[in-house]
């Protein structure tokens, strides 16, 4: 049974219908992981007692274990210990898993970006009457965002690709649909190649967006 190019072309629009689920999952994961990572990064930067040690433990665990294992622990394991989690749906579990996993990586990128900002800028902000919170929000974080943007965009791209693991929880996204189509037609190569092409296309578009965003942010610093 040779390669069926026409079958792959017919499959592409079918799979694209599930791209919305994939992107929604990744977008919610990005939003929540950014919020959590900024909190973790600030805890690490200011070395808050107890919280700093807990954040280090959190980051170490989620960076040191596979995402698939984390998803299984979250969806299949925790409900056995915490009964209130029994009703959690697969989509929500996948979003939570992606959030917890990638926040650990993003937190370190944001922390490094904040530390990379000249200390004198914080001192100058405080000297004109700003509080530490105001200085972080108005002066430090905007500059840190420019520094951290490339790595954060790369993590978002990784997150989109990692949504393919959500089918193991039963989420009906691109990979799940491709698996179903491949199983019914026995055209596994064509089905998974179609998936690869869709992910590749999304990544190419996001890479262009990243280049544009970096140029936009760097424009203010070009003399």
UniProtKB/Swiss-Prot annotation:
GO cellular component terms given for this protein: ATP-binding cassette (ABC) transporter complex
Pfam family for this entry, one: BPD_transp_1
Keyword ATP-binding: no
PROSITE patterns attached to this UniProt entry: ABC_TM1
Record keywords: Amino-acid transport, Cell inner membrane, Cell membrane, Membrane, Transmembrane, Transmembrane helix, Transport
Bilayer disposition of the protein: Multi-pass membrane protein
Intracellular or extracellular location(s): Cell inner membrane
Residues of the ABC transmembrane type-1 domain: 19-210
Location, primary (coarse class): membrane
Keyword Cell membrane: yes
Residues annotated as transmembrane: 23-43, 59-78, 90-110, 156-176, 186-206
SUPFAM superfamilies assigned to the protein according to its UniProt record, in alphabetical order: MetI-like
GO MF term set: L-cystine transmembrane transporter activity
Function (record text): Probably part of a binding-protein-dependent transport system for an amino acid. Probably responsible for the translocation of the substrate across the membrane.
PANTHER family per record: L-CYSTINE TRANSPORT SYSTEM PERMEASE PROTEIN TCYL, MEMBRANE COMPONENT OF AMINO ACID ABC TRANSPORTER
Sequence similarity: Belongs to the binding-protein-dependent transport system permease family. HisMQ subfamily.
NCBIfam families membership: HEQRo_perm_3TM
Descriptive protein name: Probable amino-acid ABC transporter permease protein PatM
Organism: Vibrio harveyi
